[in-house]
Design a protein with these regions (language model features):
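N-terminal intrinsically disordered, acidic low-complexity segments at the extreme N-terminus
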Residues: 1-24
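A Zn2+-metalloprotease active-site environment signal
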Residues: 19-284
Length: 284
């Protein structure tokens, strides 16, 4: 009849409903029951299966369908941001840049993308210091500080750039981006709306969960550097000597760190040396 009854005495209403056998269905569902523990366990098992099988599959699909225009947009935006915030124009003489570029092109020609698949850029690293990195579209950046650290060792410089070729060839940066996004989405799906602070914590957790893939990618890029350098008739162990130089000049710890995205330098040098021996034995 359109009547509306309101009361603040919730306990009395519950007692009346219980007395007349009309306790609400929703209320019963909200009460604690051992089956809730089984449900929670099932949710976590399901999430684990998604992380183990679905996320990697979706990452591969995403990488496969990403058009070149997207990777070019990502690379140009990233480099533009770094140029504004960190980098400055290289102070390396043009003759030295040309010398390095020519040596790099000889190695890049042996890769699956060829010379035309890469664009080598020189920058002063500023706060970043000695470094080199690759962007998804084949844009490579090497800093003056890294070239200075190599102290005239061309094989060391080209070995580092061959390592970056490995990252591009295997599309590591795209995979890492999509994997981190997938893990973050999975965590947020389970946790729900946890607010800005909680979201930061959870997405940081997603990044940590992806670090093992980063270490695998670094090892794979090291192996590609060894193989390309050997094909080009250069020192296949040059990338390992670069890590030794880093350890010597910058005092980096030679042991592996669990939260590091790169394997420890001692561990990497040993793996590089082992792979170089295998490549040399296979070519002899």
């Amino acid at each position: 009849d359109g009547s509306l009854f309101e009361t603040e005495d919730n306990d009395a209403v519950d007692l009346w409903l219980k007395k007349h056998g009309k306790s609400g269905f929703v209320h019963e569902l909200e009460r604690f029951h051992p089956r809730l523990l089984a449900f929670v366990a099932a949710v976590f098992v399901f999430a684990g299966l998604i992380y183990r099988f679905a996320v990697p599959a979706l990452v591969e699909v995403a990488v496969l369908v990403t058009p070149p225009a997207v990777t070019q947009w990502m690379a140009s935006g990233t480099l533009l941001s770094l140029d504004k915030a960190v980098f400055s124009e290289s102070a390396l003489p043009e003759e030295r840049q040309t010398e390095i570029r020519d040596a790099f092109n000889q190695v890049a020609a042996l890769s699956s993308r060829g010379v035309g698949g890469y664009n080598l850029n020189f920058r002063q690293g500023g706060a970043i210091g000695p470094n080199a990195f690759a962007l998804p579209d084949g844009t490579l950046v090497i800093t003056d500080e890294l070239i200075e650290l190599a102290d005239g060792d061309m094989d060391m410089i080209i070995g580092v750039l061959a390592h970056e070729i490995g990252h591009v060839e295997q599309e590591h940066s795209l995979r890492q981006l999509y994997r981190a996004a997938g893990v973050a989405g999975l965590i947020m799906l389970i946790a729900g709306d946890v607010g800005a602070a909680g979201e930061d914590i959870l997405t940081s957790g997603a990044a940590l969960m992806s670090l093992s893939h980063s270490r695998d990618a670094e090892n794979e890029a090291d192996r590609i550097s060894v193989e390309l350098m050997a094909k080009a008739g250069r020192d296949p162990r040059a990338i390992g000597r670069f890590f030794a130089r880093l350890e010597e000049k910058l005092g980096l710890d030679g042991d592996s760190s669990f939260l590091s995205t790169h394997p420890g330098t001692a561990e990497r040098r040993q793996a590089i040396d082992d792979h170089a021996r295998a490549v040399e034995a296979g070519g002899s």
